[in-house]
Amino acid sequence: MWTALVLVWISSVLLPRSHMMSAEPRNIVTNKWPKAVNQSMLRDTVPRTDNTFTERTAIVPPAPVTLTTETWAATLNSTRVTAEVTTHGTNTSTPTTREGTTDRVTSRTLAVPTSSGPSSAEQTRPTTIAGLPSLSTPHAEVPRTNASVSPRTAMAATVAPHTATLAAGTVNTSDPHTRTPSPAKSTPTDTSSKNPIPTSGAQIQGTTVQLTTDQPVHSTAGRSALSPSNATLEPTTTQVQTKEPSASTVPARATSLSPDVDVISPTTQPSPTLPTQGTGGPGTLLTTEQVGTKTTSGTASAGPTSRSSGDIKVPTTDSCQPSTQGQYLVTIDALTPSLVNKMLLLVVLLVGVTLFIAVLVMFALQAYESYKKKDYTQVDYLINGMYADSEM
């Protein structure tokens, strides 16, 4: 009983102290306090259960001193561990963080041992402060990491001008590209005007091409008459026609000139309107020539159809008539199978209905016979059999 009372009194004395220590800020090892108390209590009480009550009372006062020293040693160890963890964290995080964050981390770790405690713990504080230079060394390493960060920022700064020079390079390259299209566009037009010369394969066409290259500059700039425009457009039509039909004869070319003049005549009407919009630029002349060649290519594609028919207006009506006749024929072909299918369906329906009626009649006859024979007995069946045999 006395031992139990002593233990209760010791626990009642030590528990308020533990609560007071837990109320202080940055007391990380408050959970370890009861464990240390229990261990110290077991060490002090278990071997001395046989002693007298006076010895137990003498044991009580030194117990808190030993507990405080042990707990503060535990707290120092905990602070060192946390400081090491934080320094490792700063070493890993310094490449991305700033100096202010590392200073804050070190200040937090240094603020841990400054917590208030008993006098026995104050004697141990100078040892902890003397031991904290190990903590200050990572703080000395922090500017190194910052210094290592600064060359990276310098590298980033050096990269920035590279990017700026690249952007300038792109701008400079884009400027010549924007400047070059005008000669680039002019050169393909010249090549397009020169390409038909070897493809024509005739000396007469070569002379006509020279006339076209010389005439549009003078005729479109100064002359607005339709006769030179017709003269210039005729050889272009011959060139396009020589490109499309690979194996075309010379008389066919001669015959193609007469219908093509009628087809190109509407194209000559918009040609004088174009120089009225812009007469002072050679670029407009090139565009008019390109449009003329495109229109003649379209007319040339229509040219072979006119040759096959012979006339210009009649083939259009002929081409429309066969299409309509074909449509009528297709509709007639579509109607005849539909009628045949309807007749077949009707025949199948009639045959099916007749078979169904025949089956119903057969079932009705069998039902009627069975209805007559419902009152027959075995003797009747024998008599009927005898009569049947006699009849046979």
Curated annotation (Swiss-Prot):
Principal subcellular localization: membrane
Region called Disordered, residue ranges: 83-154, 167-320
Range of residues in the leader sequence: 1-23
Chain ranges passing through the membrane: 343-363
Compositional bias per record (Polar residues), positions renumbered to this chain: 107-127, 170-249
Membrane topology: Single-pass type I membrane protein
Biased composition annotated in UniProt, kind: Low complexity: 86-97, 265-277, 284-309
Compartments (UniProt record): Cell membrane; Golgi apparatus, trans-Golgi network membrane
Keywords noted in UniProt: Cell membrane, Glycoprotein, Golgi apparatus, Membrane, Signal, Transmembrane, Transmembrane helix
Cytoplasmic compartment segments: 364-392
Entry annotated with the keyword Cell membrane: yes
GO CC terms in record: Golgi apparatus; plasma membrane
Keyword Membrane carried by entry: yes
Sugar attachment sites: N77, N172
Residue numbers on the Extracellular membrane side: 24-342
InterPro entries recorded: DUF5585, Erythrocyte_Invasion_ImmMod
Protein name (Swiss-Prot/TrEMBL): Uncharacterized protein C11orf24 homolog
